[in-house]
Structure formats: structure tokens, C-alpha cells
């Protein structure tokens, strides 16, 4: 019987262990997509206690606590920090079988060094005191944790109207050598069907000093913001796509009419919504291509399912799930439209429904081109798939239908500074998969070949892709 989460956790053979400890373990972290608040990095936030750094904003944990029967007051409500922590301590032992159980113990090991204690009600007080003392030390500030976890790059998620003042402050601080770059997330401008679309365009008008009275004026306003992001080191755009929309792009006159209708609060047809979305996405893709930005598309979430809780807590509070819409044809036509003039940017496609894995893994092969290895990527297991089975499925299907060796690897996609341990989780799973290939005679026992591939997937490929 193996010890729980020992040094060889998830590594069942000598090849896997060699790949992990000699090649993967000490690779830096290039975290190209996350939701960390840049303000907290700029100000080098010190966290008051474990609740602040561990539970605030973590909807994975919130969902588990709700499933365990805890009242919302001790999850997102007005209960004290210690009461929320105690509720979490009572929840964790109920999470065996869920990746949260592994993540929780990894997050205590790194950076806090707690390796010999199971987390639960019996150990909660001791861990609370020990970790809270550490959190008051500079090494456990926001920047300190990033350094301890060997982070080299962090790509935050930012709206076109954001000032990027904190990114500027970070870049100008010579005492901090980790690159923190904004990522362009223009969903509120692209999704013309949203109730808040007109309010958002008014904000965009103010920050861009542009009267948005036509589709061309909208592009000019966004172009000013694109240039602002580019000046602040942006390397990537990100699109959350519940629905992949496509329609042949109409002429500018029709796009102006669609925008005028929406700005006067008139209802649009599904065709008009699709025409607007396609036109704007294709134009944005061209602009990304000019700047050598990567375009990330997160496809297939069914969001804000619980109306009562959405009214109480808003979005991103743990009430989203996997959608089951099909999107192969509109995605293909959207990418093809960008590619017809050789203006398809580097692209990473993520699907939330694992049913779509093979479709995405084959779709990326349609648009690979010379000059950029792995130009179109099948993104790492996302959200509900960033667990052992989900990561294995994505890695296996990518290796079977594409080139695993060109994969840009893992990302945290997280709001927590403790989530960097997900890179360790991914690296162990990757090394175990490749190690099994060798043991089964499916890959050569060539550590130079396989070790370099592992190092590239863990760090080098992403570093090259987002240059």
C-alpha cells in the first residue's frame, strides 16, 4: 500500500519518476492565463489569514462546501474568517475522490511546508496558527509566493476599459523580476446580446474618447485600447464563448444598422447577433495577428444557472456548469474566415465539455501553418476538466491526434496565489503518462528525447509561444 500523496504521488514507475524529478519538477512556471488581481501583485499584498488567501473567490471550494450542506453565510456571507475556515476544514474530509482533496494538501505543502498532516477538523487549529504566522512574513506575500513557486510569467485577465495602472507599476518596479502582463478580454464588446451592452459601450466611449455611432467608430475605440494593451506588454487575448457564433459578414452599412438598433434598445435577430459577433471577432483576430498576440477561446460554459444565487452573489460564484451545444461547424467557419487572408492569429482552443476533445484535437490540424510550431493549440483540461482524468484525456487525445511535443502546457486559470500547485499536479500526470508508454514499449526509453519533450511542455513551449 502506497503512502498518501508521498514523494512519488501519481508516479508509478521509475521512468515516470525520472522524468518528473530530473526534468519536470524544477522547471519554472509560465502561467499564461490566470485571474489574479494585478493590484494585489503591484501592492505586494500580505494576507491576514488563511481564509483570505485560500477561500476568498475560490468557487471550486464554495461548490464543495454547498454540497456538504453548509449555509451560504459561512461560504460567501458575513461569518467570521475563522468560521469560514472551520467550515472548510469540515468539508475537506468529505472531498475524497474529488481533486480538491489533492489540491488542498498540495496547497498546504507548497508554499507552507505542511507535509505530514491531513487537513480536517482535528488539525485545523494548528494549521491555522502555523500558516497565519507564515503569512505575515515577506516570503508569503503575493510576490513572495510567486517567487517561491518559481513563477516567471503571469498573464492576468483584463477588460479593454481597464487602465492597466497596476501592470505599469509592476513593470516599472526593478525590484520585482516576474513579468506580469495583461490579457485582453473583450467579451462585453463582442456579446451584443448582453443586457449591459449599451452601458458598457458608454464606458468604452469615455476611456477611448470616441463617439461610438458606427461599427467603424467601435473599431476605432477598440483600436485605441488595443494599442494601450500592447504598450503594456499584452501577449494574449481571451474570449469566453458560451456559444460559437458565425454568419457571413455583411457590409459596413448593415453592421452600422445592427449597432444602431441595439444602441436604441431594439431587439436583434439571431442572424444579426451572429453577423455582428463574426465581424468583430474576425477584425479582432486580424489585429491580434498584427501584434503577434495569441487568441485564446474558452468554449462551452453554461453560466449563471441559479437565478436566485446570481441575484444574490453575481457571476463567477460557483453556479456554472458544462453546456452541450455543438459548435464544430461555426468554429471551423470562423477560423477559416480569419485564415483566408492569412490573418488567423496563434490560437488556443479550450472546450469545457470533454465530449468535444477529439473534435478540437482534429480541428487544430486544419489551420497549422509553417513558421510557428503548434500555432493552433488544443488547450489544457479546463475548469471542470483540470483534474486527473480530464488532464489525462486531453493529453492522450492531443498526442493521438496532434503533436503532444508542441503543447504549451498547463495554466492555473485561477484567482488564488496558492493555485500554482496545479502545475505540479499536471507535471506529475504528464510524466506518469509518458512513463507508462515506455514501460509498455510504446515509446523508447530515451531520457534525452523524452526529458526534453517534458521540459518543453512544462515551460519552454509556452515561453516561445507567448514571446
UniProtKB/Swiss-Prot annotation:
Cysteine-cysteine disulfides: none
Keywords, comma-separated and alphabetical: Isomerase
Pathway: Carbohydrate metabolism; pentose and glucuronate interconversion
EC main group: isomerase
EC number: 5.3.1.12
Coiled coil start-end: none
Reactions catalysed according to its record: D-glucuronate = D-fructuronate; aldehydo-D-galacturonate = keto-D-tagaturonate
One Gene Ontology biological process: D-galacturonate catabolic process
InterPro entries (alphabetical): Metal_Hydrolase, Uronate_isomerase
A GO MF label: glucuronate isomerase activity
Similarity remark: Belongs to the metallo-dependent hydrolases superfamily. Uronate isomerase family.
UniProt protein name: Uronate isomerase
